[in-house]
Amino acid sequence: MELIDDNTRKFILGHRNDDVRRLALAADKYSGVDVRMAVDQIQGWQTARRKLPSWAATDGIVYPPHLNMEQCSSETTATYKRMVVAGSGNGPRGILVDLTGGFGVDFSFLSRAFRKAVYVERSESLCTIARHNFRMLGIDNAAVVNADSSDMAFIEGLPRIIEEQFHSAERGLPVEEGTENSKAEADSGMQNHIGRLVKVSESATAKADNEVTVFLDPARRDSYGRKMVSIRDCEPDVLALLPALSRFTSTLILKLSPMLDWHEAVREINAAGCVVAVDKANMVPEDDANADGVGPTKDGKSLFTVSSVHIVAVRNECKELLIVAKNCRQKALYGGCEHDYEPKMYCVDDGNVFSCSLKEAMEHSAVALATLPTGDGGAVTTYLYVPNSAVMKAGCFHVLASHYAVDGVGPNSHLFVAGRMIDGFPGRVFRIVAVSSMNKRELKRSLAGVKHANIATRNFPMSVEALRKRLKVTDGGDVYIFATTVADGSHVLIITKKAT
């Protein structure tokens, strides 16, 4: 089936740098052209140039409506997810099942880390677009399945579908005729960090080649468009699927909104999925489980436990929360769910990665606080450290402070100081010029000559706009003012410039 007719395709190529609003208003001028389709495609390509450059560089890609393009993963975040699943292994391995295929951006990147891949999507039209785009992108190891992943009967039948379609000797997955050979993957600077991002065991056995990784990106809005705050409220209900998924899934990867409480999500997954002390008698008999491991326990629990949490930011803006859970079934018959690795937390902002143990990240320990004298007694050689958005979301400030030997400015400021420059700190670094109380005379002296300033507030009783009005400064310039509450409860302004 032809998705775009020749006239419309030619129109798209000839106008893809034009203003789509003007094209839409002049639709009557273009006879024989599906202008609505053309506008969607032109707008999609223009967005892809910024967000998905490898897609924009590929002729023949069909794009969804603008809102879907804005909501889909970027090439940066999709590439990071591929690195997480690929680990340090050599070449493609195992089977990927993406149960929430959508536009197929994540799938198109993830699938290249696997020998075989299955895209599942309940929208028939999206399946048609995905099948076409995968062919254009040269993805030749993928099968497209039109199904609803919230249907428990479908999930329970997935092992049979995989067996029927993909375990035919070494043929790989069935693909459409005319599929091109896979294109070489683009290099990414983030590959330099791969050794620090994940620890994945390597195996050259046939069993490893057939291990299943399930990817889920549950919808985070209800039918009224309201944002959900718990994974229990997302669709499909991940927790409800865990027992069925544990029958055949080795690794589960959840892509969630960074607005969700990751602490609660980890607790819910572990509570629903992990049996720490496994009794063989409590296992489903092997006849009732898949061939390469045990299924859920008799009480209906699965055997998943969270192995890593990844908070992914791009240019200091949190984009995604990734939770990776491992199936304990391979060790369950031998005494429990112990892993050969310690569950980890990764805070990622472009090329900067800060990691710690997940146990440490979930603790709430106090941070040592510094004393910041104001006025003439204020320190002028100290550096101010502002954690990036990924670390802020993780909330592991005590780990950060201990690792980099920095002190907090206040108990809830999430600003840190040290008397030295620190290489690799996950965030921004400023040189403190002065520290001022809110005393009018002291403010006048500390801000003498400052007409422009960038202002941020942390645990401070005034808004940025109200403070700017009081200080009588306009936005911009090379001065950065951080208004906060320090250890003794007083309100201060930390006046800084970017460290060089």
Regions found by a protein language model. Give the residues of each.
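SAM-dependent transferase fold signal centered on methyltransferase-like domains
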Residues: 1-500
